[in-house]
Amino acid sequence: MVTIKDIAQAANVSTSTVSRVISGNPRISMQTREKVKATMKSFNYQPNRAARTLATKQSNTIGIIQKSASIEDSQNPFVLDVLSGIFSKCKNHGYATISTTKGQSIEIELEVQEMIHYHSVDGFIVLYSKKSDPIIDILKSHAMPYVIIGKPLTDDDIIHIDNDNVSASQSLTRYLIDKGHNKFLFVAETGNYEVVKDRIAGHLNAIEQTDSVTDIVYFAKNRHYIRSFFQDLIEHRTLPTVVITSDTLLNHLILSVFYELKLHIPTDIQTATFNDSYLNAFASPPQTTVDIYPKLLGEGAAESAINIIQGHNILNFYKLIPTTIIERESTTTIQEV
């Protein structure tokens, strides 16, 4: 295997000079740089990541912090699409990625601390925004570059990529009101996440401008509890005309409960959710959704993280990704039911 030492001997320079050429050090003369690069090419030498790390004091790796690495969360279409955007943008810029793999918050904190301690990453992308998050405190205390997908809660100068979830939820609710709905149920994921709060806020904004009514309920993804809740609504004849869920997986859990309870969509009840994916398109019936373009969120987060790591000036601390309502068979005009 060809090493940096072999390249240095063949080019008649020191190993430190080869390292500086690999790192792109501008103090190396053009003549020396070209000589070393020609020697590397003649040996078909490609610096491995360890060599680059030693030369540049950087790992060329970005850490990805997920809220959980449970099967449920890691297979969420939103997460998969965001990661696809991150991976493609990082690959185009020569960066690798490493993700947290634990399910509990305290375990994720330890993972992040180890990545920082061993200089495994140059910066982080956080895939969520949560109130009183100790992981953000860790990143700040170590002055680590990071980007949030979501809305930051404190510092205005945190680089973040997000949708306008208040506006998106407000638009979805108005769309349903225009369909004749006036009795809503908004089912939200537990966990104190800012995206959920914003979607509830937008929903309430739209409701308050009409004579419609709504209830907000929070569910962990617990099938038994959700089934009992809707069974009770059926028995007391208090079903809403439409259920909005804050999350696609929560929506599909509710769809399966409706199937068990023999509630037919859209004749008995209607449904809508956030984050379009193949799950929504292939559902029975296909689900009306708000497309939040998660791959664009991932690409934007990766690009911003790379720019920060490379020391580029950041002109905009906030990048907004648009949203679109995708109308499908799970919603229809009430008079047509």
Curated annotation (Swiss-Prot):
Residues 4-23 bind DNA. Residues 1-56 form the HTH lacI-type domain. The gene is malR. Transcriptional repressor of the malA gene for maltase. One of its GO terms (molecular function) is transcription cis-regulatory region binding. PANTHER family: HTH-TYPE TRANSCRIPTIONAL REGULATOR GALS, LACI-RELATED TRANSCRIPTIONAL REPRESSOR. SMART domains: HTH_LACI. It comes from the Bacteria. This is HTH-type transcriptional regulator MalR. It comes from Staphylococcus xylosus. InterPro entries: HTH_LacI, LacI/GalR-like_sensor, Lambda_DNA-bd_dom_sf, Peripla_BP_I. The lineage of its organism: Bacteria, Bacillati, Bacillota, Bacilli, Bacillales.
